[in-house]
Amino acid sequence: MEIKIATRKSPLALYQAEAVKQAIIDKHPDCICKLIPLDSEGDKDLRPIHELGGKGVFVKRLEEALVMGDADIAVHSLKDVPADLNNEFQIVATLERANPSDSIIFKESITLDQLEDKSIVATSSPRRAAQVKLFNPSLEVCPVRGNIHTRIKKLKDNEFDALVIATAALDRLQLNLENVEKIDSSVMLPAATQAIIGIEVGRDINPQKLEIIKSINHHETYFIASVERKIIKYLEGDCNSAIALICKKIKESTFEVNLRAFDHKSLKVEKIDMCFIEAELDQFYLELFNKIEDLKIKELISN
């Protein structure tokens, strides 16, 4: 059985595709897995994501490969996949979630607390930018695009003073950099599905191949991802929305959700922290969505 795996060409994307390939081979040694590296619009055009039409710019080219039969599956950083997925496609498996935190890289040996006023912190994420400004309003934020190595080079070339990057990306690429600080979740909460590798298929995938893909699914991560994606879908957030969200297991069958929503202009923030039992998921959604409406969070993030 051959499985063709569509992936973006960036070093991080190729690592993630290789991780999926290895997971398949470990469970199904007779499988032949072939990577299909592709250029996405978001990789070729380095304008701000909102000018390109939103997060989907990282997945459209891979979805085209699924439709055309050039690939059987597409591997993504799940946070790049729109929560309102086209009906032609579905996320059928995830690998185990890595560390979901963010890290900040400095040019010198300092900490986030020690960044001087007016220091420039690079990130193109409205979520990260809002939380940086809330932590220290005197800091300045500038946008940055390109793959991780490109962004780190810009830091070394003194284009800014610090750079915020997902911890999982640094870990996966084994970038043992100096002057790196993991940012505590009390300062910076991650994006929904951050650090989760997702596997997307078309609705007409070969049933045998589908079963192979489902066999590598990490069920707890998949459940957590589905919760986070459902909440993001309800919020109707887009690439300009400053939303931080994480669901995590705290004990058997019990989960906690932490939501932070920001108006990135005024820096007003609304917070929701709730726990739920897996068997009462529908009731949890009802209560959470009512709170979202009461706090007018949709209006807040659309400002």
Regions found by a protein language model. Name each.
Residues 78-79, 87-138:
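A conserved helix-loop-strand patch within extracytoplasmic ligand-binding domains
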Residues 57, 64-65, 81, 86, ...:
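Extracytoplasmic loops/domains of multi-pass membrane proteins
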Residues 61-62, 111, 150-151:
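Short acidic active-site motifs
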Residues 48-73:
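Short, structured active-site "lid" loops
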Residues 1-40, 45, 51, 134-303:
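Small-molecule-sensing regulatory modules
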Residues 78-81, 168-170:
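Short glycine-rich anion-binding loops that position phosphate/pyrophosphate groups of nucleotides
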Residues 67, 72-77, 161-166:
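Paired acidic/hydrophobic, glycine-rich loop segments that form the ligand-binding mouth/hinge
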